[in-house]
Design a protein with these regions (language model features):
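Active-site acidic/histidine proton-transfer and metal-coordination neighborhood
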Residues: 1-99
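Histidine-acidic metal/acid-base catalytic patches
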Residues: 27-29, 79-174
Length: 174
């Protein structure tokens, strides 16, 4: 949503509109959004501003169809914690935008910042739409076989359940 090229930003909204319509047609209630302002370029204040503007438009489109958008917490500084995701959830202030935390990415962020994954999850209280269960090791975010890394799955699942999460999706690598 935040690309510096206006044509790319416009195309992102067109794709989002089609995704929301498809979700509605299929009865899908939640779309997971990758928490990036930009992916193929360097982020800036302008990309973050454009991201927020287009995010607002996307959430308004989703609300019309009763589809919830949930940010996946990613591996980049832009949105690698629930707390960072919540800045945008609070900014947009619409019940059709929430957080879909990736506990592997959260675990790596917590290791980097010296913080607690469970405390970070708490910052999303009332706004967690589902939980993405994925394994990681410090500094590596993909292709880690389940239960060979450092994610404390029992603790994060318990915390998610305590916070009202009832939908869990796993990402497993073989």
């Amino acid at each position: 949503f935040g690309a510096s090229d206006p044509a790319v930003r416009q195309r992102s909204l067109e794709i989002m509109e089609k995704a929301i319509q498809l979700a509605d047609d299929l009865g899908i209630r939640v779309i997971q959004l990758a928490g990036y302002d930009v992916y193929y370029e360097e982020g800036s204040e302008q990309t973050r501003k454009d991201f927020a503007e287009n995010l607002k438009k996307a959430v308004e489109m989703a609300a019309v169809h009763g589809v919830v958008l949930g940010f996946e917490t990613m591996e980049t500084e832009f949105m690698n914690t629930v707390a960072k995701s919540m800045k945008y959830v609070d900014l947009i202030d619409n019940p059709y935008l929430g957080v879909y935390p990736d506990v592997g990415n959260l675990t790596n962020a917590a290791k980097t910042y010296g913080t607690s994954v469970l405390d970070d999850l708490e910052t999303g209280r009332g706004h967690l739409v589902a939980m993405h269960l994925k394994e990681t090791v410090p500094g590596k975010f993909r292709e880690i076989p389940f239960l060979t890394g450092h994610v404390d799955f029992p603790a994060v699942i318990r915390k998610g359940w305590q916070l009202g999460v009832r939908r869990f999706v796993t990402e497993m690598w073989d």
